[in-house]
Amino acid sequence: MAPTLATAHRRRWWMACTAVVENLLFSAVLLGWGSLLIMLKSEGFYSYLCTEPENVTNVTVGATAEPEHEEVSRMNGWLSCKAQDEMLNLAFTVGSFLLSAITLPLGIVMDKYGPRKLRLLGSACFAVSCLLIAYGASNPNSLSVLIFIALALNGFGGMCMTFTSLTLPNMFGDLRSTFIALMIGSYASSAVTFPGVKVIYDFGASFIVILVVWAGCSGLVFLNCFFNWPLEPFPGPEDMDYTVKIKFSWLGFDHKITGKQFYKQVTTVGRRLSVGSSMRSAKEQAALQEGHKLCLSTVDLEVKCQPDATAAPSFMHSVFSPILLLSLVTMCVTQLRLIFYMGAMNNILQFLVSGDQAVVSLYTSIFGVLQLLCLLTAPVIGYIMDWRLKECEDASEEPEEKDANPGEKKKKRDRQIQKITNATRAFAFTNLLLVGFGVTCLIPNLPLQILSFILHTIVRGFIHSAVGGLYAAVYPSTQFGSLTGLQSLISALFALLQQPLFLAMMGPLQGDPLWVNVGLLVVSMLGFCLPLYLICYRRQLERQLERKREDDKLFLKLNGSSNQEAFV
C-alpha cells in the first residue's frame, strides 16, 4: 500500500539517499556509451556487417582498396569495421533521443498523477532492457537488432527514474535547488556505470551474467518505490511557504494545510455565512453602507487575491516567455555538443592514436571514472542557485512581523531578484566552461583530452542543474515537469544532428573532427544570450520593486500602515 504524503515527508532523507544511488546505477547509464560500445563490439553485435579481408592480404601499398580493408579489425574474435560503428552509433542516437525526448509526456503525466507509477514503470523497463541485451548477446548474428529496442527501453526507463527523482527536492524547502543539483549530479554520474561494468567484464565475467544480475538489482528499485513513494505529487515549495503552521492531528491527519487549501476552506465558509446571495462588488458596497463591522463573506479576500491569481502565468504564457525560449537555445546547443562528443569519442581517440585500441580503451575508462565528478560538481551549481536565499525577505511573512521590524526588512534582499542573479551567474559560468571545452577539443593532443573529459563532465552536470534551478525559481511548480519535458524534447530533437555530424566526420572528413568541432564552438557562443537577458530582466524587476516601495510609502502616509489588507 502506498504511504501518505506525511509518511513520505518523514522518510524524505531515506528517499533522497536511495534516489541518488538508484540514479547512479539505473538512470542515464547510456551516457557511458564509450565503454558499452567496446563491450558490444566484443560480443559481436552487428559484426556480420564487416567483411573478412582474407582475399586482399597481399595487396600492394599502392592498391586503392587497401585503406578500406585496413579499417577491419578484430575484437574478442569478432570483426569490427566502420559499418558496424555507424549502425551502433545509430542505436545510441535512438536511445539518447528517448533519454531526453520522452520527458515531455512524462512531465505532463507526472504533474497530474505523481511520480510513483512512472518510477515503477521505469524500473521495470530498465530490467527488460538489460534482459534484451543479454538475449541479443547470446546470438548476435541473428539478434543484433534487439539492441535498438533495448537501448530505447533503457533510455525510457532511465529518464523515468531521473525525472521522478527531481520531485523529491520539493520537500527540502530553500535547499531545493541544491537537491535538484544533487539528483542531476547522480544522473550525470551514471555514465560511470558502464565503465564499471566494463572493468568487471575485463576481469572475465560473462556479459550475459552481468546483465541478468543488473536486471535483478533493478527489482530492488521497484520494491523501494512501491513501499516508500506516495501516490500524490509532492507539494511545491510555494505551497509550503504559505503553510498555516498548525497541526490538525486531532482531526485525524497530521499534514499541514497549505495556503491554497486554507483559502478554499475560508472561501467555502464565507459563502455559507454570507448574508447576501451576490458576491459582487455591489454587495460589498451595500454591506459597508449598512455599517457592518464584520464581513463574513470573502468578497474582499477574492478582490485582494485576484492579483495573485493573475500573477501565476498560464502554461502557454510560460512556453513563449523569453527565459524559456533562450534556455531552449542554450540547451539545444549544449546538448548537441555533449552528445556528439560522447557518440564520437572512441573514433576521435582512434584518430589521435592511429587506431591503437589499447590506448582507446584506457582513455575510455578514464572518461568513465571522471563521470563521478558530477556528484561533486553538480551540487556546486545548485549552491550557486541557492546563494543567499535565506537572507531574502519571505513572501509568506506575516504583515505584523514586517511592521514590527521595518529596519530589518530593508536589509533583506528580494527573493525573486536574488534567484535571477544566481541563475545569471550559473549560466554564464557554465557557458564559459563549454567554450573552454570546445577549445580543448580543437587541439589534437592526447593527454589534453583528459582536460576535455573533465570539462565535458562538469558542463553536463552544470547545465541540467542550472536549467532545473531556473525553472524552479521562475515558473510555478505545477508547470515544472511539463516545461522541463518540453525543453528536453526540443533539445533531444536538435541533438539528432549528431548522427549526420558523425557520418560527415567518418566520411568526407576521413575521421578528422576538426571542422565539426570548429562549427560547434561557434554555435556554442549562442549560450551567452540567456545570461545577458537575465541581466536585463533583473534590472526590470529592480525597477518594479522600487516602484512598489514608493507605492508602499505613499500608502503608509495616507493610512498610517503599509499593510494593504482586506477589510474584516
Curated annotation (Swiss-Prot):
GO molecular function, one term: L-isoleucine transmembrane transporter activity
Regulation: Affinity and transport activity are regulated by a phosphorylation switch state at Ser-274 and Ser-297; increasing of affinity and amino acid transport activity via dephosphorylation at Ser-274 and phosphorylation at Ser-297.
Membrane-crossing residue ranges in chain numbering: 20-40, 90-110, 120-140, 143-163, 180-200, 203-223, 313-333, 365-385, 434-454, 461-481, 489-509, 515-535
Post-translational modification: Glycosylated. Dephosphorylation at Ser-274 and phosphorylation at Ser-297 increase affinity and amino acid transport activity. Phosphorylation-dephosphorylation cycle is regulated by food-entrained diurnal rhythm and dietary proteins.
GO terms classed as biological process: isoleucine transport; L-leucine transport; methionine transport; neutral amino acid transport; phenylalanine transport
Coiled-coil positions: none
Catalytic activity: L-leucine(in) = L-leucine(out); L-isoleucine(in) = L-isoleucine(out); L-methionine(in) = L-methionine(out); L-phenylalanine(in) = L-phenylalanine(out)
Gene3D superfamilies (UniProt xref): MFS general substrate transporter like domains (1.20.1250.20)
Keywords attached to this entry: Amino-acid transport, Cell membrane, Glycoprotein, Membrane, Phosphoprotein, Transmembrane, Transmembrane helix, Transport
Domain of life according to the entry: Eukaryota
Modified residues (Phosphoserine): 274, 278, 297
Segments of this protein annotated with the region Disordered: 395-415
UniProt-annotated location(s): Cell membrane; Basolateral cell membrane
Location (main, coarse): membrane
Sugar-bearing residue positions: 55, 58, 559
SUPFAM superfamilies referenced in this protein's UniProt entry, alphabetically: MFS general substrate transporter
Example of a GO cellular component annotation carried by this entry: basolateral plasma membrane
Membrane-related topology note: Multi-pass membrane protein
Secretion signal, residue range per the UniProt entry: none
Function: Uniporter that mediates the transport of the stereospecific L-phenylalanine, L-methionine and L-branched-chain amino acids, between the extracellular space and the cytoplasm and may control the transepithelial (re)absorption of neutral amino acid in kidney and small intestine. The transport activity is mediated through facilitated diffusion and is sodium ions-, chloride ions- and pH-independent.
Family: Belongs to the SLC43A transporter (TC 2.A.1.44) family.
Name of this protein: Large neutral amino acids transporter small subunit 4
Gene name for this UniProt entry: SLC43A2
